[in-house]
Amino acid sequence: VTPSSTRPIRLLVVDDSAYNRRNIADVFADHPEVEVVGKAADGEEALKLVTLLKPDVVTLDLEMPRMDGFTFLRILAATVPTPVIVVSSYSQRENVFKALELGALDFVAKPDRLTPDATEVREELLKKVLLVRSLRPSFVPRSLVRRNGSGAFAADGTPTGFDPAPVRVLAPYRPPKCVVAIASSTGGPSALLQLFARFPATTMAAFVVAQHMPDKFTRTFAERLDKRGAVRTVEATDGDLLAPATGFICPGRKCMEMVQKGAELRLRVGPSAPTDRYVPSANRLFKSVAPLGAACIGVILTGMGDDGLEGARAIRDAGGVIIAESHETAIVNGMPGAAVRAGLASEVLPLPSIGEYLSKF
């Protein structure tokens, strides 16, 4: 159950470094909306404290003695579902995405040593802890590892039934029959991993994604999406050519737009503009694909705020389709909810149905 607005958010800090535990706790020391109710040095101690203290959110280091963060996440998801924010160094990018697949809500990237003057990290940590007030009341971690072993993924998170995506030969050039532009933020990485696992190698669509994520993580995330399914997926670079069964993730701290030159559809990747409220900007991406009219689909997944709203209006006005993730599965209903309230959603679907819908193109 998410915390009410009348009491502080109860936070449990889990890290094997006493120095890091102190620095993380200090971020919230004088904040009226957050109470640090406990600290743990490893996963075993953390599980005991979760049961005893019933925190609203946990910050988690992944590399710890006795019980590491991955084991903690598996047991937590099966016993006491609780929002978890991973605090990890830039050098541990692969581990971060493994944690997200195991059900972690989000992550904060930090330098290898967290110092009290790391202002940007402290602000990001505070923002993401406060975000738990916006979670759906029935929050359950969106783990990709099926507990019964009969789903689409093996116990280690490896997809079953898919071979690694082949490198596509793009000559002679064939444009995609449809461009699917996807907007996502908090909860988005695990949602995208599930979606991309559904897309068949025979799809005639190209997929372009604006996921709010730090710049050092988007390439690793694109590589995981590429391994997850049959669509060849990369971090976008300026000039990339859209083709059937290709996927492109906008690099962090940049914005991505589609440009059409004759029959060619290419990507333009560059710095953000002062008018961009969110970076990467789903609004800019959506507006750029809108001229395709009925040949484009805008998808708005889980996330805080309203990025994608203006772009969704442009797509609808041009004759395209907008799909919003329903509140049943959206971890945070801000972005899709804004599109629904504005009357812009052609379809409002839970995540599995979005995958089914898009896999037909």
Region spans (language model):
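Conserved acid/base catalytic micro-environments in cytosolic active-site loops
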Residues: 1-12, 17-29, 33, 44-45, ...
